Each structure stands twice: as structure tokens, then as C-alpha cells.
């Protein structure tokens, strides 16, 4: 982590296969599932003002929620105020039905308090496509 340049915001994802419906759901027992802890090391070393992590929505319920709770507890123990939400790409006019969990954290509790996840757009991709075809 020391070789990574300092930064104010960390955006990262870790392999989803260990937590995915399509995968074998081995979680932290799958080597790929432990890559979250590499992200944790970077966060601990660099202490960015904020981070954004994303993964499959199945992460939240994996191992009856224990895996997700370990992740949240780990990030909060470092000193971050953490918020999470499942968002669907289709709700933001992207042509795919893909739900992901987003985990955001802020060192400053006031920033966390002000942060709001985006709300679904009212116009659907079907609406947009219908308006552009002639």
C-alpha cells in the first residue's frame, strides 16, 4: 500500500464471484473473497477522506449477513462513517438490469450525514428510446 500515491477518494471493487448468485458463494473461503482485506490495508495506510466500494447485491445476504457485517465493522473500526445501498443500473437509464451494493465511507461524520445516494430517475430507458425513434 505504501507504493500507492496518496489520494482523497478511493474507488474500488473486489471480486464478486465469491458472493454472487452465479458463483459458488464461498465468500472469504475463496481467495478472491479475501481481496477486500487488501482494500482495507490500502484504506488503513492512506486514510482517504472518503471511499466508494461496489459489489453484487448478494454480498449483503452472504452467510446470513455475517460477511457483510464483517466488512462494515472493519471499515467502521478504522474510523469511517459507513452508508450502504443497493442500486439498479436500470433506474439510471442504463440498458441493463444489474443490481449492485454500494458502500461509501467518510472520515468526517458531517460529510456522511450530508451524503445521499442518488434517487432513481423518473424517465426509463424505454421512454428515452421511444422519444428518439422516428
Model-derived features with residue positions:
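Class I S-adenosyl-L-methionine
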Residues: 2-9, 16-134
Amino acid at each position: 500500500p505504501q507504493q500507492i500515491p496518496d489520494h482523497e477518494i478511493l474507488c474500488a471493487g473486489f471480486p464478486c464471484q465469491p458472493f454472487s448468485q452465479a458463483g459458488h458463494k464461498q465468500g472469504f473461503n475463496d481467495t478472491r473473497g479475501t481481496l477486500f482485506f487488501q482494500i482495507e490495508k490500502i484504506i488503513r495506510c492512506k486514510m482517504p477522506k472518503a471511499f466508494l466500494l461496489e459489489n453484487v447485491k448478494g454480498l449483503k445476504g452472504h452467510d446470513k449477513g455475517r460477511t457483510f457485517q464483517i466488512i462494515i465493522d472493519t471499515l467502521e473500526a478504522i474510523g469511517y462513517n459507513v452508508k450502504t445501498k443497493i442500486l439498479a443500473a436500470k433506474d439510471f437509464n442504463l440498458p441493463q438490469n444489474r443490481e449492485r451494493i454500494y458502500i461509501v465511507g467518510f472520515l468526517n461524520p458531517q460529510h456522511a450525514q450530508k451524503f445521499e445516494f442518488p434517487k432513481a430517475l423518473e424517465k426509463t430507458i424505454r421512454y428515452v428510446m421511444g422519444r428518439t425513434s422516428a
